[in-house]
Structure formats: C-alpha cells, structure tokens
Design a protein with these regions (language model features):
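N-terminal helix-turn-helix DNA-binding core of bacterial DNA-binding proteins
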Residues: 8-51, 70-71
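Beta-hairpin "wing" of winged helix-turn-helix
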Residues: 60-80, 88
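Basic amphipathic alpha-helical segments that dock to polyanions
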Residues: 52-59
Length: 120
C-alpha cells in the first residue's frame, strides 16, 4: 500500500530534506537552491553543484519535483525575458516532505520529553 512506499522512501538524507524544503515555497533554480539550503541548514549542508544536480536528477526521476520554466525578470536588459529552468515540488513531493517533517517532530518531541524529565 501507500504506507510501505512511504517507509521505503523515508527518512530523507539531510541534503534531500533541505533541497525539498527549499522548493516548498516557490520554484527555484539550481544556484538559488544551493544558497537557500546553506542558509536554511545554518551552513550544515553545503552542496557542491555535482551533489545538487545528482539529487535533482534523482528527485525528478522519483516524481517528487518537476521542472518549470521561469522567465527572468531582470533590470538587466540582457537577462530580461530569458528563460531558465527552475524546479518545484510535485504534490507527491509535498506529501513526502510533510511525512518527513512529522517524523522529525516525533523524534524531537521524544528527546524533549526525556531531557526535560517531563515523563510520567
């Protein structure tokens, strides 16, 4: 069923998690994903281009993200109107990310419970 599919595909690696998180609000192109992941992870995850594009290729193949065309809206005339590839989460990708976030919440809640001594 759907549950076994989810189990096989989570937990996500940190790189995959942050890439998907980066795409959860709006489509982004490769370089913007790299910068965003670095900032979101507070420098824990610094992606090389090779790692990023390998991950994007895999995510496209899994159907978790898709390519969209983004028209550059730039004040620089040369750039303006040029199309570049951006990536966005699919509805399946959103579902996977949501499940992973819930999984992480459970892990953190357990730690909080144990370390604050709040358990019965």
């Amino acid at each position: 069923g759907g549950d076994s599919f989810i189990m096989e595909n989570t937990p996500l690696t940190e790189a995959t998690y942050f890439i998907m998180l980066s795409l959860s609000r709006e489509p982004r192109h490769g370089y913007a994903i790299m910068k965003d992941v670095q900032s979101l992870s507070e420098d824990r995850v610094i992606l090389s281009t090779g790692t990023l594009y390998g991950a994007l290729k895999r995510l496209l193949k899994q159907g978790w993200i898709e390519r969209v065309e983004e028209e550059l809206d730039s004040s620089n005339d040369e750039e303006s109107g040029r199309i570049r590839k951006a990536y966005t989460l699919t509805s399946l990708g959103r579902r996977i990310l949501e499940i992973e976030i819930n999984r992480l919440h459970v892990l953190v809640d357990a730690a909080n419970l144990r370390t604050t001594g709040a358990e019965a």
